[in-house]
Each structure stands twice: as structure tokens, then as C-alpha cells.
Amino acid sequence: WLKVYTTIDPDLQEKAEELVKKQVAINKSQYGASSAALVSMDNKNGGLLAMVWGPDYFDIEHGGNNNMVIAKRQPGSSFKPFVYALAISKNPIGPESPVADMKTNFGKWTPDNYDRSFKGIMTVRNALAYSRNIPAVKMFYLGWREEEIVKEVRSFGMSTVVENAGYGAPMAIGTAEVRPIDLMQAYSVFANLGIKRDVHAIEKIEDSDGNILEEYKIEENKEPIFSPAS
């Protein structure tokens, strides 16, 4: 027989399942949505701590046994920080630099904000914090080209964002589909000051005599994939 050691934290897994059930109940009453997913990891070593892809695995009618954690979905505003990171890394701008949140025609597209209002001149930091759409699109253009942004987010782990897909500027507000587990890994890069860790669920595997057959080893002295300053 084999003994498999996983990275899953039983307490966090239980709490994650409870949270998903509660949130699904809210989503169902407000939006008619019957499912949700949650995935978490240790930013420092990439170990998967909890993973839930629905309130009830056996609820086949509502896709309970479909793993939504690896399903492609539009990330919406959660994609914006990556656009900002590239813009800041390629331009002489920072968190306190001004950016205009006002009605702007980007050629064939004039986007709006969620609340249908405009805040005028604000800092880059606040534009991201308040999730304003127009500044995010401006950051997209400061990131040089769509290919540059695709290359960056793929380096963060979002492998479902592909080249030559024609996302265009709407990509800045999250139209390119990603997998929740990849988005989680990408966000961990921010928390880990630019260091990307591989997501894994198995720590080690031993045989019946206690011999280690396989063991995950973290890569030491790994170079950051982007500047911590960004």
C-alpha cells in the first residue's frame, strides 16, 4: 500500500465548504445562481489548502460534480491588477500618478463604469481600488499591446489566455476567460513579491516501508517574474 500526504488543510477545507454553501444560498435568492467555487493556496510554497466547486457534489442537476475550479470563466474586474502591473512596469507612473475617470471614446468602443458615473481625476491607486473601468482601459493601452498583456498574464499562470485571440481593449475589464485555480495562482505572485509558485496538492508519497517514492520540493532562490515595486 501507499501513503499519500496532501497539502489540504482539513479545517480550512471544512470552512470553505461552509462558506460556499452560504454564498450559494445568497446567490440563488438574489441572482438565481445555484453554484459557486472556492480555491485557496499557501502563497509561499504553492500548496493547495482548500478546494470546493459546489455546495453539493452529488447534486447532478446543478452540476455538483463538475469541477468549476478548472472551468474557464470571465474574471471581470479581478483581472485589472495584472493590466495595472504591466502599465506601471513599462511607464514612469506609480500609485499616486493621476488618471482620468471620464467618458472616453477608444475608437469603436466607449465603455462605461458599473455605476454609470465618472469620478474625474483620481490616483492610479484609487482607480484600481474602486475598480473604475475607464482608467483600467487606459492602463491597457499603456501596457503597449495586447500581446504584451497576454504574455504577462500567461507568465503569472493564466494559461487559458492565448495569443492572437483578438480580445482587444475589453480584455482590461476581464473578458478573457481564465480558470479560478489559475487566477488564484496569479494573485499569489503579488502576495509573494513577484515569485510564482507551482500549485500542488501532494506533499509526498511513501510505500508500505516508509520509503519516500515522490516528494514535492520547492524551488529555492527563484527569480521574480515581475518587479516587486510594480
Where are these regions (language model features)?
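Surface-exposed patches in mature extracellular/periplasmic domains of secreted proteins
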Residues: 3-4, 26-38, 96, 160-171, ...
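A penicillin-recognizing enzyme superfamily signal
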Residues: 6-29, 38-42, 51-52, 59-69, ...
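Generic, well-ordered alpha-helical scaffold segments in large soluble proteins
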Residues: 15-23, 90, 130, 139-142, ...
